[in-house]
């Protein structure tokens, strides 16, 4: 998407890019020009791709913790999708992976480990931006509980979650509450839905897992106020 601003009417909004590849190449060429690197008249074009002719020019590797931290702290959808496809590659290592492989991996874990019927839920991407994802608070809570009881999962997950009033997508929330510096949770929002899920320590020192999903939300700000109040109560 590209942000659009109209000075005359003081309007700011977002529009979808019709062809993202054209936008990418146009922006890429513009950045090259800014660095003094110019190209000819015919700057770029599409060409047919033969599968056997695909070659890897370079590989960039990053520790999974770095990708996880950016996916959670900054709510980076690209990092979330990358982890989704990485999971898919582990689940189906012998062919070119697709989103269905990632969905199958999640469904298998959901059924064999958590004991939930995958037919009752629907997951179509790794970032959660699709309106065709359907899960329940109870299912998400079971994932959080499973992570807590497996320290090799919990420790990097806990460190990567935004901290209320401190950083990430929760940097400006719950600042004047008991939840500040205590709640570690992931935010989520699509049209009409706002969510918050993670961990909070109660006054007795016990670690609590919680999931809040508000549906049919007209104003996301109101849902966030509600979520923040719940977190404040859980912290007391």
Language model features by range: what are they?
Residues 1-4, 8-155:
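A small/polar active-site loop signature that marks catalytic segments
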Residues 84-236:
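Small-residue-rich helix-loop
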